[in-house]
Swiss-Prot record:
One of its GO terms (biological process) is ribosome biogenesis. One of its GO terms (cellular component) is nucleolus. InterPro entries: P-loop_NTPase, TRAFAC_YlqF/YawG_RiboMat. This is Guanine nucleotide-binding protein-like 3-like protein.
Length: 313
């Protein structure tokens, strides 16, 4: 009787089984990649084609406002980080000064003041003198109104004149603070000229508390990251639109959008984004305010956007 041959097992070895699973996974990945490539090649209708023009404009405005909100948040975050640094500078200024001068823009004194810095000066018992700068661009009666208003808290309020500056003695240590562009160094040079020598002084720049129409017209804030069209609209509502049309050589307009469109056409401002075009047109429009070709000022107790305007020849 012969020996019965043993049947070969159908079980796979571990090595073969793992190899088959590995090849299966690789084939599955390859299939998914091919499916994605084929899907990408399929022509799809963009969502913008399915929307009406009005819906597209609304969608673009939503995106623009979301971008502005993010930029405003980033700016607020940066300002909060800078706040402690400038307050430290004010503390050093107060400690080294006998008299503290706050340089204020006469065109809008309220928005150019810094209440936190003023409070530090008061708490340290130092004398605060408010100096109104740019008074030559404001009607005399408006300057006088502001001087009376600012003196109500017991502080001195003067102008950059020889008679007013004489009260600052040569031996006095002076601390000067104010917003960017307020004219701090101009005031210091005026004091040096009147006293016939440069006084012992410390100068600190303090940020504005918020964005206002006058701070934009004074060049303290750029247009990037703010709702600049709202401020242009506020100007259009209050200014002589006929005079603006003559100065820029543009047709008559009734609102900010028509003004900016006309400036874009006249100066050949073109860009893929309408918002960028309008920002460039706004910067061109604001040049006359920065160069003092269009004067502006705010009266006591007026709203922060309620400015008066006058045109220079």
């Amino acid at each position: 009787m012969g020996i019965k041959k043993k049947r070969q097992s159908k079980r796979l070895t571990t090595r073969k089984r793992e190899g088959m699973l590995k090849r299966a996974r690789a084939n599955e990945r390859k299939k998914r990649r091919m499916d994605r490539k084929m899907q990408a090649k399929v022509e799809r209708i963009p969502p913008s084609v399915l929307r009406t023009d009005e819906e597209n404009m609304q969608y673009a405005e939503i995106k623009r406002m979301a971008k502005l909100r993010k930029m405003e948040y980033d700016e607020a975050l940066r300002n909060s980080e800078k706040k402690e640094a400038y307050l430290d500078g004010i503390l050093r200024l107060v400690s080294k000064s006998d008299v503290v001068i706050e340089v204020i823009d006469a065109r809008d004194p309220d928005s150019s003041r810094n209440s936190e810095a003023e409070k530090i000066v008061s708490e340290h018992g130092k004398k605060l003198i408010m100096v109104l700068n740019y008074t030559q661009y404001v009607p005399r009666e408006v300057v006088d109104e502001w001087k009376v208003h600012l003196k109500r808290d017991g502080n001195d309020c003067i102008e950059v004149t020889e008679e007013d500056m004489r009260q600052i003695g040569k031996e006095t240590r002076i601390g000067i603070f104010g917003n960017p562009g307020s004219g701090k160094n101009f005031v210091l040079r005026g004091i040096s000229r009147i006293l016939e020598e440069k006084p012992n002084s410390v100068v600190v720049s303090v940020p504005l508390s918020k964005v206002t129409l006058s701070s934009i017209l004074r060049g303290c804030h750029g247009l990037m990251g703010i709702a600049f069209r709202d401020y242009i609209e506020a100007i259009v509502k209050r200014i002589d639109r006929g005079e603006v049309s003559l100065r820029h050589g543009i047709p008559e307009f009734s609102n900010a959008e028509e003004l900016l469109e006309s400036i874009c056409d006249v100066h050949g401002i073109r860009d893929e984004s309408r918002s960028v075009c309008y920002m460039k047109a706004s910067e061109r429009f604001l040049e006359d305010f920065l160069r003092h070709k269009i004067l502006f000022w705010r009266r006591v107790y007026s709203d922060e956007n309620d400015l008066s305007f006058a045109f220079c020849q």
